[in-house]
Amino acid sequence: MSALLDRLRTDLSALAGQGLRRVRRSNALPCAPRALVDGREMLAFCSNDYLGLAAEPALATALAQASSRWGAGSGASHLVSGHYAVHDALEHRLAAFVGAERALYFSTGYMANAGIVPALVGRGDAVFADRLNHASLVDGVLLSRADMHRYPHGDLAVLARQLAGSSAARKLIVTDAVFSMDGDVAPLADLLELAERHDAWLMVDDAHGFGVLGPQGRGALADAGLQHWRLIYVGTLGKAAGVSGAFAAGHGELVEWLLQKARTYIFTTGAPPALAEALLLSLDLIEAADDRRTHLAGLIERFGAELTLSRWQRLPSRTPIQPIRIGGNEEALAVARALWDEGLWVPAIRPPTVPAGSARLRVSLTAAHTEADVLRLARTLNRLEHAAHG
């Protein structure tokens, strides 16, 4: 047998031995708090479907009707023949929704981030990145071959020193808006002030804020009251929006440059036009979802108030991402298994997704959960911690 396969087997065994080997679970029901896994009914706190739109009947109907009208696929890349009138309509609607001059629709959030950064910076340029940024931003920086300066999470003093010490012709600050494993919100106004002071772009990945934060769910920049030509806003359309894809929004010339230079936009088949049509309805639903956002905010508050943890730590978060830091990989996995045995599906997040020694449960609350759901989870966590640590 090949030494290549032997090496793979050894590496896979090592992952398992460190508690780092990932396992997929197959859900036999549509995306909702109630799941069916291996024939067992579970109450799930896993998805990023923050407004409960993924299985919204009106949205499913719109997608089915759009598929009948547009067919199943686009047939080509956007810059050949895979760009349709409904893609234009979606981009205009997205730009207006977030208050930008123009928007560009990408197939996924990962592709947006991996394409935008290399389109803006390259060798000899400098990128300044929060250490807890999403992997797609990290990969975008690596692909760009620009010099990467990572600053400790939220440490603006270090960032300011890094910016002041850089002689790069082009500078780019990149940050999550809502950090995906911590749930906290970046200090966007302060970051923009630093970007202005040092003549840098500021790229904000609002994967977990779009649809949830700000007036009518218009996102983290709207929540902070920020608009500026140097802002590059990235929103995800497969989380709160309930469908699929992502978009970049900003100054018109910036977006035109991305259209010309973002390789993950140029060299891939365009997203099906039916998805774009469904997303037009999704934006209407987001805009009208104040009741859902109010309900979700209430669940977040109720969950925090009900927890009485002393050893495990709930990280402070006003967003639907409610992390419970456990510590070691094996203990986090054991807690997730204990919850699973009680019919509660909560993922254990381990390195390299989070720093070593900070393995955690990533609780995701959605507007489709009930107060009873949230209380059940909180009380079970309280009981499990007491049983484990007294």
From Swiss-Prot:
Cofactor names from the entry are: pyridoxal 5'-phosphate
List its EC numbers.
2.3.1.47
* Gene Ontology biological process terms in this record: biotin biosynthetic process
- Its top-level enzyme class, in one word, is transferase
User: Which Pfam families does this chain map to?
Assistant: Aminotran_1_2 (PF00155)
InterPro entries linked: Aminotransferase_I/II_large, AON_synthase_class-II, AONS_Archaea/Proteobacteria, AONS_Proteobacteria, PyrdxlP-dep_Trfase, PyrdxlP-dep_Trfase_major, PyrdxlP-dep_Trfase_small
Entry binding sites for pyridoxal 5'-phosphate = 109-110, 180, 208, 236
**Pathway note:** Cofactor biosynthesis; biotin biosynthesis
Keyword Transport carried by entry = no
Q: Which residues bind substrate?
A: 22, 134, 353
Named from the GO MF annotations, one term is:
pyridoxal phosphate binding
What HAMAP family does the database record attribute to this sequence?
BioF_aminotrans_2
* Subunit record text: Homodimer.
Q: What does this protein do?
A: Catalyzes the decarboxylative condensation of pimeloyl-[acyl-carrier protein] and L-alanine to produce 8-amino-7-oxononanoate (AON), [acyl-carrier protein], and carbon dioxide.
Q: Which family does it belong to?
A: Belongs to the class-II pyridoxal-phosphate-dependent aminotransferase family. BioF subfamily.
This protein is called 8-amino-7-oxononanoate synthase
